Each structure stands twice: as structure tokens, then as C-alpha cells.
Amino acid sequence: GLSEQQMLETKGRKTIDCGKWQVVGLPSIHGKALFGRVPLPGDMTTPPPYPPKFHHLRHGQVFNWWIHTGKLSVVHIDSADFIEQELQGREADIVCLCAIGRKYRPNYVKDVVRLLKPKYIIPCHWDTMLTPIDQPPKLLPGVNIPEFIDEIKACGVIPLFMPILGELYFDQNK
């Protein structure tokens, strides 16, 4: 775990210096990720029992993360719903884009590309995270990776699909 001095609570919108990098939490809202509903709504005001069961957990405040390394900017959109105003005025070389729940937000990929103008999009949040790391991952219900990749390409952006435990190299000069 992290020591107390390494932890920082944020309400978002403020630049957090992380060495030479800068990080900003952009307030967001959780998408309808499972069966058209927001999973685990609400906040946790006390720690859950240990070990927690799934129904003990809550998602709390949702953020998208803008990360600037000095040379490269990355935005991680971890829910298929977002607040457009929070993304306006920012650009990203790479967007890690949530694959689950996109069918519940019309023009999801188009809106992200229009707002952030990325060169690359990495689909994320597409597997159940329940399979052993050395076995093929299982898709979350409703995720269609080939369709998602086609949608990314149709917006003029290069999709980078990251294999589990794999490495992916790409030309940053394109």
C-alpha cells in the first residue's frame, strides 16, 4: 500500500504535480455500464467489511484523468459517460477509452475525438477482470471489440488494442 504522505484527496480540476508529470482529475459521471444501469452508485463513508463483497462497494466520485508527461498527453476515460465541458480545451495524444457502456451513449467515440483530437485510442475496461492473468480474458457483457475498433477507425484515429500481459509499440511520429 501507499504511505499517507503519498496519498492525495482531490475534488478534481486542480493540477497535481507527480515528479515531472502533471495529472488532473476531470469530474465525470459513471456510465450505464451493466445492463443499462449505473453499477455500484453512491459513496462509501466507512470502510467495507473485509474481505468486501461486490455489493458492499460503491464507485464514489468519478474522474477522467488527464496526464501530461512533458512530451505526451494521455486522457483516461474510465466510464462511457462524461461531462463534455470538463474535456473542452484539452487535447490528448492518446485516449484510453472505456469500451463497456458505449452503446448507451450516442456518438460516444465521435464526441471524444471531436473534443480531445487524439492520434491513438486504446480500448480499456472491456474484460471481466475475473479470469486468471495467464488465461484468455472474458469480455464484459455487451462489449464488441471489433465494432469498437471499426468505430475508432471511422473517426480517423488509430486504435491500439493492448493484449493482456503483452507489449505494444507504436510510432509516435505519425
PLM segments and residue spans:
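Generic recognition of short, well-ordered alpha-helical segments
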Residues: 2, 107-108, 143
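Helix-loop-beta element that forms the nucleotide-linked donor phosphate-binding surface
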Residues: 1-7
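A structural micro-motif
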Residues: 5, 21, 72, 119, ...
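Binuclear metal-ion centers of metallo-dependent hydrolases, dominated by the metallo-beta-lactamase
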Residues: 8-15, 114, 120-174
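Short, low-complexity, polar/charged sequence segments that are solvent-exposed and flexible
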Residues: 42-46, 95-97, 114-118, 140-143
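Metallo-beta-lactamase
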Residues: 53-110, 115, 119, 123-133
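Core dinuclear metal-dependent hydrolase active-site scaffold
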Residues: 11-90, 166-174
